[in-house]
């Protein structure tokens, strides 16, 4: 049976991932560990014969640079790439920049877990004077939808942000049987998975996306979901 494969991958580990900090929309580089992760992922995709017609990523360099490495490794740097703020990581509001240890010490373990793993609970909003406030960032200045840019997000609001982009941009290409790779972030990929598999709240909050490992979703030509699997184990 002919199948359509969609490849999803969380960016390689970033400097703040290695420090266990809330990153969100803060634009942090890949760490050396992360660079090695995505290079290996690219080599594995090549060894399994993967090729693509189109690629999607966010406006954050840890995802963009991860995609660049993947495409270089499979010798497809020339394919079209679309970047969108809608594929950015979940915005962690005022938590951005702080380590999980610091937040747990200040607010307690239960509150930390609610902010991290709750479905509809958003952290405190980021303040306009915060060092990591993004509304004046040049990459967002030309957005007609600037009023939609978040100050903090829950997983639910992240899904709501991604849904129209999925419906209007990504899914039509899949229906057209294009071979697509999406390199994004833990929560934006969780959002896509919820949409793909129609998971409920309890199911999606249990999903964990590791850095730098391609996750494959297979569909038949009628876009009926068949199976999913990671390309390799770490």
Swiss-Prot record:
The active site is at residues 11, 89. GO terms for molecular function: phosphoglycerate mutase activity. It is an enzyme of class 5 (isomerase). The keyword Secreted does not apply. Pathway: Carbohydrate degradation; glycolysis; pyruvate from D-glyceraldehyde 3-phosphate: step 3/5. It catalyses: (2R)-2-phosphoglycerate = (2R)-3-phosphoglycerate. Disulfide bonds: none annotated. Its EC number is 5.4.2.11. Substrate binds at residues 10-17, 23-24, 62, 89-92, 100, 116-117, 186-187. Coiled coil: none annotated. One of its GO terms (biological process) is gluconeogenesis. Pfam families: His_Phos_1 (PF00300). Homodimer. This is 2,3-bisphosphoglycerate-dependent phosphoglycerate mutase. It comes from Wigglesworthia glossinidia brevipalpis.
């Amino acid at each position: 049976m002919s199948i359509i494969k969609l490849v999803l991958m969380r960016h390689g580990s970033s400097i703040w991932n290695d420090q266990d900090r809330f990153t969100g929309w803060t634009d942090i580089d890949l760490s050396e560990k992360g660079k090695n992760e995505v290079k290996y992922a690219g080599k594995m995709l090549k060894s399994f014969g993967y090729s693509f017609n189109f690629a999607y990523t966010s406006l954050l360099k840890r995802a963009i640079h991860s995609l660049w490495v993947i495409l270089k490794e499979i010798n497809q740097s020339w394919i079209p790439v679309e970047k969108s703020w809608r594929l950015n990581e979940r915005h962690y509001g005022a938590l951005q920049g702080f380590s999980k240890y610091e937040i747990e010490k200040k607010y307690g373990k239960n509150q930390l877990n609610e902010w991290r793993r709750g479905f509809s609970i958003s952290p405190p909003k980021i303040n306009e004077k915060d060092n990591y406030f993004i509304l004046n960032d040049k990459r967002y200045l030309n957005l007609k939808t600037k009023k939609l840019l978040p100050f903090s997000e829950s997983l639910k609001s992240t899904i709501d942000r991604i849904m129209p982009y999925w419906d209007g941009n990504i899914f039509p290409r899949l229906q057209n049987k294009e071979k697509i790779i999406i390199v994004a972030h833990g929560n934006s990929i969780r959002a896509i998975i919820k949409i793909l598999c129609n998971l409920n709240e309890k199911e999606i909050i249990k999903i964990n996306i590791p850095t730098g490992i391609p996750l494959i979703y297979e569909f038949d030509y009628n876009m009926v979901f068949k199976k999913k699997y990671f390309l390799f184990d770490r």
